[in-house]
Each structure stands twice: as structure tokens, then as C-alpha cells.
Amino acid sequence: GPPWKVGAVKIARHYKWAFTKLFDNFSPDTPAAIVVEDDLLYSPDFLDYFHAVAPLVEIDDTLWAASSWNDNGFDYLVKEPHALYRTGFFPGLGWLMTRELWNELKHKWPQEHWDHWLRQKRQHKGREVLFPAMPRVFHNGVKGTFMDRKTHEKYFARIATNRDEKVKWRVPRAYGGGTDGSIGEIAS
């Protein structure tokens, strides 16, 4: 088949292998994993962000993941480093996979295009993904299975990323979840 088709199959198999090794073989007590790719650059608060939002994914049944990416996080649109949103669309690119979600998905993991598959209602079941207005990763790759310089320049080059080392996150004390949309006190 075409190179992108072969690549899509290899990537889906690789993710399944990695999640199986992590959750089912190596770390039976690990509650979640942050999934990253080799062509991402990270904000100074990347790990702090996930430390703050992981408990939200754990306690809120209307969430199924957290991402550090915002497809609409263009540098001319986003200025607030603490703003968080919810979406029904899986953003990917630096995201949190929980053990609970893996246990739900592992027996039906797709043969290709795992990210598009996760966006299907049968998988997310109406649950949402938490993500920052200002991304915590920057997509740096210009060559890959689904990437070339033209695509990168068109869709990724103008995406902002937090560069402020002073941004701090706290684990939330209060959280409104899906009811009123409030996030509680997680930024300082």
C-alpha cells in the first residue's frame, strides 16, 4: 500500500505495544502515562500542567483524557497561559492516557489511524478532553509519516507554546467538572 497507509499501521501497532508494555507488563500500578512524540518541544511547565490536570481526569467522569495541545492555539489568538478548555475533539500531541482508559480500549485497539479512531463517539462515549488555551508543546517536525514542510508551515508553525518559566500550576482543591465548567484553583 501507499507509504502513509503502511505508516498508519506501524504507528497504531507501536502505540498498542507501548501501552501494553507499560500498563500490562512493566508498571501494573501506574495510574496514567503522558504520551509524547519525538518531534515535540516542551514548555517549562509541561509536567506541572499534567500534574495539575491528571486529578481532574481521574475524578470527572465527563473527561476521558487531557492534552497539552490546542489545534487553534495560534500565536495571535492565545495570550492567557492559565486558561483551560474542554473539547469533544481529541487534540493529541502530548496527552494523558489513564490505565482505566487503556483497560477500556485495549481489546479493540485499531489496526491503523489510532487518533482518528479515538475521536469516534464509540470510543470517547461523549466524554471530553481537557486542554490548555496556550499549548504546552510545540510540533517541531517537518518530515514524517503524515508531515512535510508545507503542512507544518500551514498548520503548525504559528501555534503558540508557553515559554514563561514563571507559570505555576497547583493540584485543584475545587472542581466544578462538567456541571458549571469551572476549573477551580489550579493556577497561581
Where would I find each of the regions flagged by the language model?
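A structural signal for short, well-ordered beta-strand segments and their strand-loop junctions
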Residues: 35, 65-67, 96, 129-133
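Short beta-strand-to-loop acidic/aromatic patch adjacent to the donor-nucleotide binding site
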Residues: 28-41
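Short acidic-glycine motifs
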Residues: 2, 33, 76-82, 87, ...
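Active-site-proximal specificity loops/subdomain of glycosyltransferases
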Residues: 1-31
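C-terminal catalytic/acceptor-binding lobe
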Residues: 110-188
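Short, high-confidence coil segments that cap the C-terminus of an alpha-helix
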Residues: 28-30, 60-63, 127
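A structural signal for well-ordered alpha-helical segments within the folded catalytic domains
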Residues: 13-16, 44, 116-120
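Conserved catalytic core of nucleotide-sugar-dependent glycosyltransferases
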Residues: 43-116
